[in-house]
Amino acid sequence: APWTLLVYMINKKSPKQNLRADFYNNGSLINQIMKLLDKFLKVHIKKQVENGAQIIQIFDSWAGLLNDKDLPNYVYKPTSSLVEYIKSLDVPVICFPRGIKKYKDFCETVKPSVICIDYEVDPIKILNDVKIPIQGGMDPKILLSDKNNLKKEATRYLDIFKNHPYIFNLGHGVLPETDPNMMDYLVKTVKDY
């Protein structure tokens, strides 16, 4: 997503450090960069679709850094622009606005085909808040546990979403220290459900 790309562009260290100062001291530059990112991403997305992509996922890994006042301008608006463009290509779009608290508002404003949730989201609450398909949610740290706990947590997610369109996935990336055998076990658990 444009916002997350911008965060990486303006922060030399951790995205959480000095972001607010950069954000407020360089507002016009930030808006110019966001417009350029929108154009660049649309070219990139078009090439992806031309080369066989059947669905596009927009990752906004740093959306949660923004307060409620700034979310519409820096997350909702630029992401909506991309979603509209992707849908005009007749391709469904998944949005992953990690760390935001207002998934219902996001879905109603941005209108993705699917919403991907992070591991801090209450799966029962999101199920009541949104009517579109949901992806993800399970904490990747559970893969560092034992098979019994992993199966129990995976089954909990599958049970919660059994009557709602759901794509099983983690609520963020696989941790580097994850045993590949645990990933195999997770896949088997989901397939056997």
Specify the residue positions occupied by each region the protein language model found.
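Active-site loop segments of alpha/beta catalytic cores
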Residues: 1-193
